[in-house]
Amino acid sequence: MMPPLVLGAQTGEDILDMCAAPGGKTTQIAALTQSQAHLTACEMNIPRAEKLEANLHRQGAKNVPVMRIDARELDEFFRFDRILLDAPCTGTGTVISGNEKSLRGLTEQLLGKCARSQRALLDRAMGALKPGGTLVYSTCSILPQENEDALQEALDKHMDCELIPLDGTPSESETRRAQEAGEEPRVECNALTEAIAAGHVSSVANGMPGTLTIPPSRDFEGFYIALIRKRS
């Protein structure tokens, strides 16, 4: 799965998977860090938290505490080097074209509920980052209300956080640094930017350059992903 690869977690770091059940991305982070990071998973739904714990055990992910709380109410005490927020959403990226049954549950009420929750989760996630820490925000939706609109609102509130582009362009702070130093700006690369450059993944334009909307295809369900860093 792409979000844990973009997160780029390292051994020894404090890492949070905010909406972790059923645990596929959590176990991937544990594997990528060889269980040598301080990884915490969060899930407020008790049956889903129990399934998460069972999956972590089954996959051999060691020393991953599961907090059975609403991540929107995460204590101010907590601070993390990296946070993965794969937020609950309408799932429009998984809708099958022409399949009316797959559209049946998509209502304005559901969209509004998801959008409110996503904004609260983003607000808490940005607040819980350490200086220099990074956040991956992803959904399996392709609707702007759940993606770039929600993210822009959070960035407007958290002025100490900035977008790290995933489209092969430098960030604003890197552009300024390079200009002051008389250098070419550096572009941060990860598995997703490399896959796009190689033509393995296609994205479509959205309302926030630097974030990616991946449309549904034979190879992928549709999803949205963005990378944010809190300035040091």
Predicted regions and their residues:
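S-adenosylmethionine
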Residues: 1-232
